[in-house]
């Protein structure tokens, strides 16, 4: 490989933006190719890099007890642009890290535009990248251009898998009736930049809840195209009406659970179910309906969601929608450094690899950028410890999944959020300071602390090993 020719990154989402940043910070030229605004998608609204098209939440920021919070911490340690921009544009969200989506995208775009080693090319790559590009990271996400997707299928000899992601509505804050609704985080928990009163809560009694569930189940939804009909949903982003169809109590044990919340307007009466809205921009003028991603037709959304107490006069800045997500059978197709086995000049990053979630996509982009930078310099990165959040995620994508052949039954690789189930087990169960065995919640919490403590120690050791690109110093 030539040391002077640029590395190419296709796709300017979270993964591609992070990959390009890591390469440039390692002192190497990189070209970031983004097809917007020349070609729009059904989910994006702007031409900004790293646009958030679904939720504005990066989920929990608790690095001691939560796997995604640990991933946040590891990415910050490795100089993540996505985490830097997220921290600089956070909005209150209880125990979660949520961001002002426009400010976040603007910060990422400006940082990459200002970097002397980054070139942003506004063009579509609708097919295999030219053979002269000897190092390419494909980070085209769930909306990969059809020509490129077909070219990838041709290389791999396999059909890509796909599922649907549904998008939640956003409501204008001033249209919410705060004589009915109230501010409170679940269990009054204050997260990064939060106060413990970061969500707007809309209560329902049993009759209201049952009528709402019935309306969701009867609501008219968008129809599927023939090629979409057999595409499964990802369980972490189910449309609210699909959850309603799974059972009458599913929603009140999911996004509408009433636990940890007290209605100050009527404190002696416990709500049967509660709809929560989370701040969506820094000004606090927009709130998104938590867990209310939907494929209902727009008119149905307005009609049904205005039956929620407090939202009777709701004005919607954006209604919910639906888009298709395509991803690879990565454990079979990719090597340990995210290269396509059939064409090693191509690496993959982000949702197309089968990770799920903004932070996970950016994390895979971060490592793809580092792998590409090390390879360009003729070095090999030491394998990530699978005990770290980054290592556990990469290991799952590139080989940790149990294949159908191994279990003797049909089983497909599915998108995965980072979670402690991906981490190797502890050598010894944690014990209390006095040596006694722990049980119940105390045991679970101690186990999580032990896993995150081990991860921090192992990442520190990995960062001290030779052969890392400059961006990791």
Curated annotation (Swiss-Prot):
The keyword DNA repair does not apply. FAD binds at residues 11-16. GO terms for biological process: tRNA methylation; tRNA wobble uridine modification. It catalyses: uridine(54) in tRNA + (6R)-5,10-methylene-5,6,7,8-tetrahydrofolate + NADH + H(+) = 5-methyluridine(54) in tRNA + (6S)-5,6,7,8-tetrahydrofolate + NAD(+); uridine(54) in tRNA + (6R)-5,10-methylene-5,6,7,8-tetrahydrofolate + NADPH + H(+) = 5-methyluridine(54) in tRNA + (6S)-5,6,7,8-tetrahydrofolate + NADP(+). It is found in: Cytoplasm. Coiled coil: none annotated. InterPro entries: FAD/NAD-bd_sf (IPR036188), MnmG-rel (IPR002218), MnmG-rel_CS (IPR020595), MnmG_N (IPR040131), TrmFO (IPR004417). Its main location: cytoplasm. It holds the Pfam family GIDA. PROSITE patterns: GIDA_2. Residues 425-452 are annotated as: Disordered. GO terms for molecular function: flavin adenine dinucleotide binding; tRNA (uracil(54)-C5)-methyltransferase activity, 5,10-methylenetetrahydrofolate-dependent. Its EC number is 2.1.1.74. Its cofactor is FAD. It is an enzyme of class 2 (transferase). GO terms for cellular component: cytosol. HAMAP family: TrmFO. Belongs to the MnmG family. TrmFO subfamily. Catalyzes the folate-dependent formation of 5-methyl-uridine at position 54 (M-5-U54) in all tRNAs. This is Methylenetetrahydrofolate--tRNA-(uracil-5-)-methyltransferase TrmFO. It comes from Methylobacterium sp. (strain 4-46). The gene is trmFO.
